[in-house]
């Protein structure tokens, strides 16, 4: 009995001991600790592993059971050996149990003879300067270890405990969960600068007294490893006794140590040790020294291997101890989402290591640290690392002598890297690197190709990723804000990007950077984009990519990314707006059809300081019919006035090309009108050079894309991709598309076969307006597996040489990432990785390209590959010859069919001749417009050999057309349209056709020009009913193009009335034109088809006062967002449609009103002749004067009574919903029985501050539809006043300016002048908008621009602010007619300083202080307010994020600490204020004579603009400027001080009545010129009239914010020239006036 009780007691104790344990227990052979086995993903990431789906061994963590048998503490909070049972004189393993909260006795330290291993399941705190000497620490789940200024010293494990940890976690720290904090009380890491060879000045400290008696350890440019010296000091000057630092070393870090005692907290070791963090441990390390930590060397990994019993999976029979365990580093952190390492020093072990820092699936913030050691990498980020933010760290590396012999087993990171990453989410800003061969090495390997952790998830880590072998990566950007290093020594490579072939179709982008080192990429299956890159010094791009895009970049001599064998290899290349040095540029010849390669080659090395190529046309391969005309254009930007003597010369390899201008002197544009006479192709080259100078002074050579000249093509064959065995036909405009291709690669009997790796999809979204077209695009095919080629084989005629192929795709996005589309013909690429983007809505994609059948093929193979979410719906083939359609048919007797058909055709032709003859006279003066519907494309009815009127060439509308003509036709598809093509910058954009005759660009980049006539009367595209989001929104346009501005009359253009459905089409025509808008609705389809062609007679339309009924035929928001392109529609809109709402209180109505009331008798609802009584006829929703809350649903009821003896049918058209309101009702139609009251309910919800005045249109008709009446029911509701504004209530008055992020208009809101800023969607970050608005709402200061409210209209965000009519400060600095006195200048500066002082007191930095963002309200120094600070789009609250590192603002106004990659502080605004003062007084833009790239260098060298002694003779003014732009931020004054100082300065000038205006200095008395006064006055009157006109223009162009005044600076030269002429005319008059005065 006693034996049984004893056993039970042992089991209970054992179970209690193991309450902390997780995982299963594993038994090991004698001499080893038993192990616990944990599946890390299941226990730490909560990601379930499906049985037998993956090999779980790589996911398993084995840790020793040391804590099971450890001695546990008594119930005491004081940590001492007495509180643990057992001998205090032997090394012991002890454990602080769960719930215990122990603190080390302040008078004690832990001696190695007492403790071997300390296990913490409760809480343990060690205080200041206490030393813990022990073998290791194990933090169990839930445990907490706090080391506050304590010292940890690791020693070898006890020799008396003979058991071995097979996985070598100890000595060191092993954390399985809970939290660890290692925090020092004193800052230990400092920066310094050399004064003499052995003297340093230590930054940010006034005295070195706290470190008296210490040694100093130093890392610098010359010493990448730690060097230690004794020192003496005087205040913060440090003189080293054992070390000499060269004065040329600019990056010096130092820390202090007390001969190894680590007085201020740290870890040292007498043996090899490591820190292993897992289990979502919360880790915080700050002001702490980790010295000589780490076990893993840079040799090949050698992990411990376990052999398990075949009978028992929990029994290990043999163990082979690894000699180089991976991840036993200074710090290895995995599965931890809260890690902070700040202002600490991490020194690797004394030998070589793989890396000091290794992270795996963790979120880490590491900043302000020194990481130094002999290692393969300074930091390694593995799979699953969700987020690493590294900033202001100093990574110093000594390359090891040992490297692994094989890259297998995930043996990466040994190459000498700064940061090596297998994760894309690395943010490295302002980090300093010293000694590395490679700064950033990114290796994106699909997991199935990596042994070891081959099934580990990586970002984004989702539930299913563990069982998915390889996920496609999202597009990855390397930009200046994310990867922004400071490299001390030259490196071999700035960036290496590698991806194996399994990771396909991913775009990698390097952008917004100046790069002086090499980049190597291995992206065989992916694309690389270089955007806004400046390559200097040793920049070189090498490697291999599938597609290379280069945009807006400049490459200096010997830095060109040459293409081909000597540089980077790519199958497809896109080069636009980028310059290359002639001798270094090499271009491969095998370019695919979709490539657009237009480099600007230059020979003059500093050409970018004199002249730049702004744009060219055409920018991609161009197709044009024989006899067509084209303007070849090169637009230039002249930087230096020396380059006024330039000429452009055109060269051609085709003698049949004629041009009216072969060599032409130019100012800002070269233009060559060309005519093409014969079939074939031509290559053109334009040379821009200095006039009358030899070839050595060539500025640019531009080789234009190939131009193809062709005759018309005819329709040959078409196929619809249906899963159909029937030989059905879809007829579109007389062209037959056969249904279905057979799935068989060996079926030669069919004219179309498809590879068998496809899947079908049916019922794709209806995207058009014709049943035939809907049927053509209703079904589609794609590959079963992602990125797998689908091949279609179809017949062609072997004798025909030229074909065009047109493919119709529908893209249905599965996420917000673009889908790359690749197309091949006969295994040759046509398009590679064309990105299809559509946010969340499906899009229609039409791609057209040429095929030259030079091998006389009878069959052609067309292949495509996508992610699996883009479907080929149909295809068409066009032939250059008239050939019979290749579909076999049975031979039948056609005579009985042909004879009656011929008779019928003759009769119809006679009728048509009579009909069109009668119409000829009526239209003979009109410009004829002809359109046929094939998708949304235009085609020519020019006589050809086409057997049916189909596209002579299939065309795609494109938005980037640079042809222009004063007499042109333009059809523009709005930016919100879902018709998508590839634009000139290779982004998918809405499309535009704009022609001199007609010019069109295909999605392939091929541009077709042909003489196209468009006939609106033949176009009828019927609306469809679709509850899903349609592809094309309704749009109409009433456009007045007459010279006298008179509006069009509907009666005059009745035959031009059409219903157009297809994406906000803007139509400009010389002739008359009238189009109505009908949006989708829930009415009966047949009803609107019946009513659509009806236009109400004038006597049937209700009489409406001006503003009472205003249709909105123009898409307002898109015209406002593109004021340059839509100049004429914008002018028309501002003139005619000031706003939708018209006058306050007037009623609006639905745009389909005319449809519903057509052919009815309109009567007021109180009219006794109306056969139905309506009550109430004004609905106020029971408010009784109360105002509605936003979001409140307001209900009302309308009752109808039929006064007739027969039933009536009532149809209702409710107001259209928008961003400000929604009107809804369950009733759209009801039957009204005789003499019976019938009621309907409706509700209105308001979402903005608005006065809601709308109408419900009601149509009554008899059941036989022989009689019909219509009336209005009025809706009236008003919301509470909030800061959410209804855009419909804003009256837009005029365009002011456009900046990077938005467009600004002057407007009126509820009788108050306001500035309306529309934010461009491509720059909209909704979180940033909310932050800015939250900031604006809280700012209330007389010198800060007043925030009025916000709005959303048609998906566009807008901000409304106070309007300052006098414009921005820049105008008063740089325009002569606005010169201001010194008193006015000082008064303006006072207001600016007061505003900024207010911002800084509230923890806000402006970050973009410059004259363009200062608005002038008054020039009277006595006014309460003279200036206001605006544009808070770049402001940040410093108390929200302590480290403001987003690089924004104007470079000339950026302080040295920003440009040297430092952080934003309030003092950066002071620096900008100093530059503003300089510009204000000197009337010169800072660094105006320097190129953009030089400014940063000058600022960092502390070279400021020179102060003209004549201008800055007042030392008070010059003192403000020089103190504000001081290199040392701590020496800059505050805005509170500046405000007081400027007020004192204003009194000084005001008292002395000094007018400091250089324009008035030269006025002299001249009494001899009185006789010339009158003549000069006459001339001056004329000049004044011109000036007044200019004043009016300037008043309309006052700039508000967001670069609103940039145009002022750009136009200064022109203004100065005009003013100089004026001043010359007025010179005598001025002298005379002065004399008279």
UniProtKB/Swiss-Prot annotation:
What cellular component GO annotations does this protein have?
A: membrane
Q: List the catalytic residues.
A: 1408
Please report the stretch or stretches of sequence annotated as the Protein kinase domain: 1290-1547
Biased composition (Polar residues) is annotated at 977-990
Q: What is its EC number?
A: 2.7.11.1
Extracellular-facing ranges: 20-896
Q: Cystine bridges: which residues?
A: none
Q: Which CDD domains match?
A: STKc_MAP3K-like
Residue numbers binding ATP: 1296-1304, 1317
Q: What membrane topology does the UniProt entry give?
A: Single-pass type I membrane protein
Region Disordered: start and end of each range? 977-1000, 1557-1637
Q: Cross-referenced PROSITE patterns, in alphabetical order?
A: PROTEIN_KINASE_DOM, PROTEIN_KINASE_ST
GO molecular function annotation: ATP binding; protein serine kinase activity; protein serine/threonine kinase activity
Domain of life (superkingdom): Eukaryota
Is the DNA damage keyword given for this protein?
no
Q: One Pfam family of this protein, by short name?
A: PK_Tyr_Ser-Thr
**Keywords tagged on the record:** ATP-binding, Developmental protein, Kinase, Membrane, Nucleotide-binding, Serine/threonine-protein kinase, Signal, Transferase, Transmembrane, Transmembrane helix
**Which chemical reaction does it catalyze?**
L-seryl-[protein] + ATP = O-phospho-L-seryl-[protein] + ADP + H(+); L-threonyl-[protein] + ATP = O-phospho-L-threonyl-[protein] + ADP + H(+)
- Record bears the keyword Transferase: yes
Q: Which GO terms describe its biological process?
A: negative regulation of developmental process; regulation of developmental process
Cytoplasmic-side segments: 918-1637
Q: What happens when the gene is disrupted?
A: Cells initiate multicellular development prematurely.
Could you tell me where this protein is found in the cell? Membrane
Protein role: Regulates the transition between growth and differentiation.
Q: Which family does it belong to?
A: In the N-terminal section; belongs to the GDT family. In the C-terminal section; belongs to the protein kinase superfamily. TKL Ser/Thr protein kinase family.
Q: Please state what the protein is called.
A: Probable serine/threonine-protein kinase gdt2
Instruction: Please tell me the species this chain comes from.
Output: Dictyostelium discoideum
